[in-house]
Amino acid sequence: MKRLSIILSIGMLMAAQFGLSGAAFPSAATSGTMSGMASVQGTAADYKAVADKAAFRKELASKTSALTTIQAKFVQTKYLSVFSREMKSEGRFYWQKTDKICLDYRTPVAYEIVINGDKIKTVNAGKASFIDTKGNPMMDQMSTLITSCMTGDLTKLGTDFTVNVEESSADYRLTIVPKSKTVRAYIDKMVILLNRKDLSVNRLTMYENASDYTMYDFTDKKFNAAIPQTVFNMR
């Protein structure tokens, strides 16, 4: 359970503020309620089904296959109904092909999450913790879902998830639902908003249940620029 708690509290790289135990590190809190849910994922009237889903997925696969690195600023907004408020954090996001991810939280406190292959590292208050997802099917699914959602690359999802694709005048909306009941006990669904022009991820929201969510907004994105390998250091 400790290993599962770590990867889930990693927040699917989104819920880093609170683990299954409810333990937390400081986060800037703002007032917020579920009345803002429509702004999180858009209203139903804003979106319609993509006419040619196969063509869309082909274009998306083409775009993501051309990527070697992604760098961006992010703002994480976490809502927990038990507190009836939003908690915000900011930092830098890094991704490198293949399967290297770093979330470098900078405010309100320093915190780091690194995924490098089947290894995961978290650094909190200068103390590093490590877990290995190899040989654990559920944790492997979690890691795959993280990478796919953060980069917009759906090719690795396979048959373990259902994917619904919709569009509006502003963006594409992908709703990803795990088929595994075990996974859904912790992650109800993922909603991704993609930029219509370059199909990059503008927003990623994880719904832990009907009322709690963690949302990432990405800005100042850079593609295929060199990233120092120290960013993904597992030591």
Protein language model regions, located:
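A mature extracytoplasmic/lumenal domain signature
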Residues: 76-78, 99, 105-109, 117-119, ...
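Gly/Pro-enriched, hydrophobic low-complexity segments
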Residues: 131, 154-235
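N-terminal leader/targeting segments and the immediate start of mature chains
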Residues: 22-85, 230-235
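Short, solvent-exposed helix-to-loop capping segments enriched in aromatics
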Residues: 64, 141-156
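N-terminal mature ectodomain segment of secretory-pathway/periplasmic proteins
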Residues: 64-122
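Bacterial N-terminal signal peptides
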Residues: 9-19
